Amino acid sequence: MNRFLIFCLPLLLPFSIVAQDNKEKPAVTYEELYDEPYSVNKLFIGFQPLYGELFATNANAGFGVEASYYYKDKLDFKAHFRKTYSSNFFDFNRQAALDNSDLDFTNKPQIFNYFELGGTYHIKDFDGAGKTKMVLYKKSLRGNKWAANVPLRAEVPCKVRKIYGVRLGGIHWKSTVDLNRALKEQGLTNADLVNNNGEGLLPINPITGAVRNVGVFSNLSTTNIYIGGSAAWFRNVAVSFEKYEEGLDDGLLTLFFDVIFAPGLTLDPVTYLGQDYSTNAVKTSSFGFRAGIDGKFNRTMSWSYGGEVGIRPSIAGQGFYMMFKIAFPVFGTNLDYKVESFGK
């Protein structure tokens, strides 16, 4: 009998914990303060102190600036710029060109920079019934007490604004390119880079007369057009909990997918000893796609996040990229500065 009890106790323990846990979770009451998913800021401007891009053409990281504008329930626009802080942090190919390029090559390594401007037309913009989960917080649980506590969450019904849209925009970016790697991946050599006389790029060692193994770099510039679709979910709800601090959910989340085409893609010739050597032998790809996420909050000052993954028009076989970005601070405003005035 004792052995049977010893065997059963471990099995009954989880049920006891669950029962105790449920007992310690009383229902909470709340009062709705507002639930207005259409009452969001019109303009958001954010500084991005850090972004990172794992790009097959050129891995890079740096800073950026981003702005979003919402025009009623019809359109929204987005502008974005980012660049590397320096070649050391972090512009991989540019730093490699500065470290390894021969003095006889006069191409100036290009700083990675990226510009984007686009808009979204709201095909369908509506709200519906939804739910959100809010953390129950007490001021008495500040500091170490809060860190040691497993927070409770309350499920609150709310309105959810849903936006299905069509996206259209343009992208322009520039970067240094490692031609040695591109040539090797495409089964080519420096001899395939030819000047006006049809002579290949074969630097000769004046002492030994042998062909020198040199680092060859160029600059790539692309102008892209993208078209795609997006889905967004906006919440803007606040409630007052009994015995807890107020709860808030003002998240603005957007998912998108774009097809990208580059009508303008230029790979600069290599300049060696004053002569230009054509890069036409290097294959490029003008098509790509991306999927991404953008998130921010409907506040006067907050932060935002985003990420993308896809194939970018670039050197053939070097288009894959993954990117993340974080913005802080992000300033939001509804651009409504009017006040009523009355004569005495």
Briefly describe each language-model feature range.
Residues 19-44, 128-159, 241-250, 333-344:
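Outer-membrane beta-barrel biogenesis signature
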Residues 20-86, 90, 173-177, 329-331, ...:
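Short glycine/proline- and aromatic-enriched beta-strand/turn motifs that initiate or cap beta-hairpins
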Residues 41-43, 57-63, 109-117, 162, ...:
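Residues that define the transmembrane beta-barrel architecture of outer-membrane proteins
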Residues 43-51, 63-69, 79-85, 162-174, ...:
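Transmembrane beta-barrel strands of outer-membrane/channel proteins
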Residues 58-126, 224-226, 233, 259:
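Glycine- and aromatic-enriched membrane insertion/assembly motifs of diderm outer-membrane
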Residues 73-79, 125-130, 238-239, 297-306, ...:
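Repeated loop/turn-to-beta-strand initiation elements of outer-membrane beta-barrel proteins
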Residues 116-129, 318-344:
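Outer-membrane beta-barrel "beta-signal"
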Residues 171-306, 311-317:
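Outer-membrane beta-barrel transmembrane domain signature
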